[in-house]
Amino acid sequence: NYTKVPLVIHETFFYTSDTLKNGGREMFGFLKKKNEVVENNTMYAVANGTVIPISEVNDPVFSQKMMGDGYAVVPENGEIYAPIEGEVLSVFQTKHAIGLKMTNGLEILLHMGIDTVELNGAPFTIKVKAGDQVTADTVVAIADLEAIKAAGKGTEMVVIITNMDKVAQFSLEKTGVVTAGTPVGSATAN
């Protein structure tokens, strides 16, 4: 009991010399979109623990937003996850920080602990490298929280947007006890 209805699809192509040089691939949007990345503005909890506003971090460089806006997680255990969907830009030689880039172009610094640069990487096992693609369920590092505490350092995992000039809006929407990978905020690029 189907009715046959004619379907007419009409497409107009405008050829340019660039289109012809590239074998006409630009004519077909579906070929081009295969490599496009969908923007994701969501920021996630990097560990099981307690999310706090960056203003509550016990270090003025972070709490006064000198490096940018963001949030922190006081972790319950040492499994540290990516705070965003995107790409790893760099891993600091001292292993205490990882630079990332969101799919929307915003740059994020995951700073593991307070003053942990002085520990020369000892309490951190890094699980990613520059160029890796990450999601909220990607473990980026294992932090030995007991070693960090024994050295007299804070264990807060601080997530900072470092290129604030490119931010249209940042909002921290969830604080308190969370599990790793829980959406806690968003950052949109301008």
Predicted regions and their residues:
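Short, Lys/Arg-enriched N-terminal segments with co-localized hydrophobic residues
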Residues: 1-26
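Contiguous, well-folded functional domains in the mature portion of proteins
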Residues: 24-190
